[in-house]
């Protein structure tokens, strides 16, 4: 009996480990993209309502991890309560991606900074959108 009960625990641990790895990969990818931008002399300076702000590597890493954790929460809820979590996830995240990029181009900054910040959003999305959903039984019992 304990052997049967251990099966879901192992599977859940794999899902969690897979999602942690996904967030780590997204973080490394955005960090690398940020560094490539710096090598290309992008200054990452933006004017905000509270003053001029430099988008640092640390800020990029924290933002990516935060987006990954938020995405994990959303996909977990979708997997629990919807019959098509992957479809809803993809539609929702693409809308969020577009809505996150629009303000980048409305913020006063050099064009190379704006383009690189938009690229950073796309890099994180390129990893998180396809990789966070995991195959398992949904709320309706389907895979």
Describe the residue ranges of each PLM region.
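Membrane-interface helix termini and inter-helical loops of multi-pass transporters
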Residues: 42-52, 108-109
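Membrane-helix boundary connector in multi-pass membrane proteins
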Residues: 102-116
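Canonical alpha-helical transmembrane segments
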Residues: 59, 63-80
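Alpha-helical transmembrane segments of multi-pass membrane proteins
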Residues: 27-39
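Internal alpha-helical transmembrane segments of multi-pass membrane proteins
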Residues: 18-19, 76-97
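Membrane-water interface at the C-terminal end of transmembrane alpha helices
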Residues: 18-23, 123-143
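Short, Lys/Arg-rich, polar N-terminal cytosolic tail immediately upstream
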Residues: 1-15
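Short aromatic-rich membrane-water interface segments that cap or initiate transmembrane helices
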Residues: 50-62
């Amino acid at each position: 009996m304990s052997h049967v009960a251990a099966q879901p625990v192992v599977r859940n641990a794999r899902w969690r480990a897979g999602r942690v790895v996904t967030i780590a990969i997204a973080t490394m990818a955005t960090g690398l993209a940020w560094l490539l931008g710096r090598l290309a002399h992008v200054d990452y300076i933006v004017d905000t309502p509270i003053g001029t702000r430099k988008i640092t590597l640390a800020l990029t890493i924290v933002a990516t991890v935060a987006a990954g954790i938020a995405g994990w929460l959303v996909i977990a809820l979708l997997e629990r309560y919807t019959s098509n979590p992957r479809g809803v996830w993809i539609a929702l995240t693409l809308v969020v991606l577009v809505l996150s990029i629009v303000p980048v181009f409305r913020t006063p900054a050099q064009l190379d900074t704006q383009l690189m910040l938009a690229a950073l959003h796309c890099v994180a999305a390129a990893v998180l959108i396809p990789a966070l959903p995991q195959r398992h039984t949904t709320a309706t019992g389907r895979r």
